[in-house]
Amino acid sequence: IADSQYGIGDTIFNGSTFSGFNAGTNLKSTYGWAPFNFGQNFGGGTDFLGFTGLAGGFRDFYGCSNYGYVTKQAFWWSSTKQSEDLKWQFDLRNNFTTLIRSAQPERSGYSVRCMKDPD
């Protein structure tokens, strides 16, 4: 995910944390997400920004064939490195309305999404 593509800059994240309250909801697709309900029904999103973020899970960074959370989470690599050994990743989860950013080892199995620069 390109940080600037959707107006989500470094100052909004304040390091490695959550973005604004509804950023995740606005990026998630309206379908394909497992419901989550602890008094609130998050699950899928509104796709307000047209990103259509689909749940797809991830493969853990231990190199095992553990692949999980296919209908509950979605992870994408950023094109930006946090350090020599870590790269930024973004994730959406069925139990959060926010977009999460954290630095992870490149051996983690996350999705890649090619984005066209806006004209």
Go through each PLM region and give its residues.
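Conserved positions within compact, well-structured domain cores
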Residues: I1-D119
